[in-house]
């Protein structure tokens, strides 16, 4: 260890306080801190901080974003409800791309389940389905099934590679989990793990914060750290070598995610897009979700906190909210576009500033847990690159079919928790059974009514999930039903299992057959 060189480097960068407790540390602690500091580029970090603060101050003083916002124009919008005559063509195109081994999925899985009350990665969480499957297993099985669907459709054996971005905190436990479960039936060589970067937390005056005498306070660099990680770990090269063209990017916490959704892929391909966003219709003006729109003619996501209530409440002539394209972190990119992002555009992206309450050691070495923000964490967002797309498109889907995020613990009595996620999936699977000709009966043998949901265009539609059930207690859900992804990717192929048959709930349909569960066991 050349401590004098390190001291000089830190002094030049104005970060010499990081060695304040050096002489108090044991040798092993010194080695640990030395290695951590040696790995940092302080000149770059100071530049990041300066640009992030400039951007933060500029946006704080910038004139209201409202006047510069335009909604997504209809010509770049595809809709699962309003373009039903084109859905089959988009699906066929997407399945063709999959059959040609040109589609991969990229999972953003850096988050721990801290808000869920667990210390392991979110993807390992079990929301309490009858099968006890975790989010990782559900998504892996959807990939397996979709490969089979594409193969059956076009006759070609195919592979959908799965790229999984973890963080420093989740990498090892995620890899161990996949190894333990034999990659859920996927081939190990087609599941590629890589790690997003970390950045130190900094005080408002640009000083790196120590969380212990020998440890810097570090945090992941946001889901937009994806692009730097793609470059650093040669992931784009791997995609190019495999002949991949289309990438579907999504977050781990959405239990309803249609991994490598052929309709979404096909829509983007047929539109000639290099970048696309899947959205759900925002129906409540105050719903805390960002909206995809144009600002000064450039596509981006505007966070709900940046939009005035008056603008959020604006409606178009058909009664829908004017700014209704709710962002769900579900995106399409072409590999050539990602190559351009990695080589050209990523360095142009500014970090966003998140003011945080960051525990730190004071000059006496005492751990302080502040009760108000005392510093910043810097992060980039995955959607920051929309602005660079040559052809950007938006695909709108039904929330009850495709979006139920897992953010909070049940104990927080809100939404987006294990109960709402579980109910959303079971409500959807209930609908699949009804649409395939199955029926549910109560304890007296009477058929339970199935009420089709009216489509927005006024025509009768297939039965869709009732999102009102998603917030109720598990015991209040009228129908508990789970269908393994290995049996059906999106409700297809269920007729042979359920048509003209009657079932008691809870019902499970999996590779071992059809099971009606009772309260005290099977």
From Swiss-Prot:
SUPFAM superfamilies: Nucleotide-diphospho-sugar transferases (SSF53448). UDP-N-acetyl-alpha-D-glucosamine 2 binds at residue 472. GO terms for biological process: antiviral innate immune response; positive regulation of type I interferon production; UDP-N-acetylglucosamine biosynthetic process. It holds the Pfam family UDPGP. Keywords: Cytoplasm, Immunity, Innate immunity, Nucleotidyltransferase, Transferase. Pathway: Nucleotide-sugar biosynthesis; UDP-N-acetyl-alpha-D-glucosamine biosynthesis; UDP-N-acetyl-alpha-D-glucosamine from N-acetyl-alpha-D-glucosamine 1-phosphate: step 1/1. UDP-N-acetyl-alpha-D-glucosamine 1 binds at residues 108, 110-111, 196, 222-223, 251-252, 290, 303-304, 327, 381, 407. Gene3D superfamilies: 2.10.10.100, Spore Coat Polysaccharide Biosynthesis Protein SpsA, Chain A. One of its GO terms (molecular function) is UDP-N-acetylgalactosamine diphosphorylase activity. UDP-N-acetyl-alpha-D-galactosamine 1 binds at residues 108, 110-111, 196, 222-223, 251-252, 290, 303-304, 327, 407. The keyword Cytoplasm applies. UDP-N-acetyl-alpha-D-galactosamine 2 binds at residue 472. Its main location: cytoplasm. One of its GO terms (cellular component) is nucleoplasm. It is found in: Cytoplasm, Cytosol. Widely expressed. Expressed at low level in placenta, muscle and liver. Its EC number is 2.7.4.-, 2.7.7.83, 2.7.7.23. Changing residue 453 to A: Decreased interaction with IRF3, leading to decreased pyrophosphorylation of IRF3. The keyword Cytoplasm applies. It comes from the Eukaryota. It catalyses: N-acetyl-alpha-D-galactosamine 1-phosphate + UTP + H(+) = UDP-N-acetyl-alpha-D-galactosamine + diphosphate; N-acetyl-alpha-D-glucosamine 1-phosphate + UTP + H(+) = UDP-N-acetyl-alpha-D-glucosamine + diphosphate; 5-diphospho-1D-myo-inositol 1,2,3,4,6-pentakisphosphate + O-phospho-L-seryl-[protein] = O-diphospho-L-seryl-[protein] + 1D-myo-inositol hexakisphosphate. Catalyzes the last step in biosynthesis of uridine diphosphate-N-acetylglucosamine (UDP-GlcNAc) by converting UTP and glucosamine 1-phosphate (GlcNAc-1-P) to the sugar nucleotide. Also converts UTP and galactosamine 1-phosphate (GalNAc-1-P) into uridine diphosphate-N-acetylgalactosamine (UDP-GalNAc). Monomer and homodimer. Belongs to the UDPGP type 1 family. This is UDP-N-acetylhexosamine pyrophosphorylase.
């Amino acid at each position: 260890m050349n401590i004098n060189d390190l001291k000089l480097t830190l002094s030049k960068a104005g970060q010499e306080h990081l060695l304040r407790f050096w002489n108090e540390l044991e040798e092993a602690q010194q080695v640990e801190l030395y290695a951590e500091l040696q790995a940092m580029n302080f000149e770059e970090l100071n530049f990041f901080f300066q640009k992030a603060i400039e951007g933060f101050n500029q946006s704080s003083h910038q004139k209201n974003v409202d006047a510069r916002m335009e909604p997504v124009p209809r010509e770049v919008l595809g809709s699962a409800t309003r373009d039903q005559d084109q859905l089959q063509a988009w699906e066929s195109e997407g399945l063709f791309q999959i059959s040609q081994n040109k589609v991969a999925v990229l999972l953003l899985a850096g988050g721990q389940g801290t808000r869920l009350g667990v210390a392991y990665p979110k993807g390992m969480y079990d929301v309490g389905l009858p099968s006890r499957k975790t989010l990782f297993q559900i998504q892996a099985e959807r990939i397996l099934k979709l490969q089979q669907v594409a193969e059956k459709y076009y006759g070609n054996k195919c592979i959908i590679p799965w790229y999984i971005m973890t963080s420093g905190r989740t990498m090892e436990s995620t890899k161990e989990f996949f190894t333990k479960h034999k990659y859920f039936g996927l081939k190990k060589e087609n599941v590629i793990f890589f790690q997003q970067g970390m950045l130190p937390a900094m005080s408002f005056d640009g000083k790196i914060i120590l969380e212990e005498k020998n440890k810097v306070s570090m945090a992941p660099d946001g889901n937009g750290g994806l692009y730097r990680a793609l470059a650093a770990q040669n992931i784009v090269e791997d995609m190019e070598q495999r002949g991949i063209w289309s990438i579907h990017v999504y977050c781990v916490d959405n239990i309803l995610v249609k991994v490598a959704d052929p309709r979404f892929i096909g829509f983007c391909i047929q539109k000639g897009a290099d970048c696309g966003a899947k959205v759900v219709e925002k129906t409540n003006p105050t719903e805390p979700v960002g909206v995809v729109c144009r600002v000064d003619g450039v596509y981006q996501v505007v966070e709900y906190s940046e939009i005035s209530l008056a603008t959020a409440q604006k409606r178009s002539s058909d009664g829908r909210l004017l700014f209704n394209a709710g962002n769900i972190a579900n995106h399409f990119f072409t590999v050539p576009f990602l190559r351009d992002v990695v080589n050209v555009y990523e360095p142009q992206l500014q970090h966003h500033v998140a003011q945080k309450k960051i525990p730190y050691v004071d000059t006496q070495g005492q751990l302080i847990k502040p009760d108000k923000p005392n510093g910043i964490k810097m992060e980039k967002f995955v959607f920051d690159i929309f602005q660079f797309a040559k052809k950007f498109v938006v695909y709108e889907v039904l929330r009850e079919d495709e979006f139920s995020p897992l953010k909070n613990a049940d104990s927080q009595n809100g939404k987006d928790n294990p109960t709402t996620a579980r109910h959303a999936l079971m409500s959807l699977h209930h609908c699949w059974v009804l649409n395939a000709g199955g029926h549910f009966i109560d304890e007296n043998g009477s058929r339970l009514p199935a009420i089709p949901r009216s489509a927005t265009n006024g025509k009768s539609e297939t039965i869709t999930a009732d999102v009102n059930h998603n917030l109720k207690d598990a015991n209040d859900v009228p129908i508990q039903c789970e269908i393994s992804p290995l049996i059906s990717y999106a409700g297809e192929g269920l007729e042979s299992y359920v048509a003209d048959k009657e079932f008691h709930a809870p019902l499970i349909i999996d590779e071992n057959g059809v099971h009606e569960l009772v309260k005290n066991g099977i």
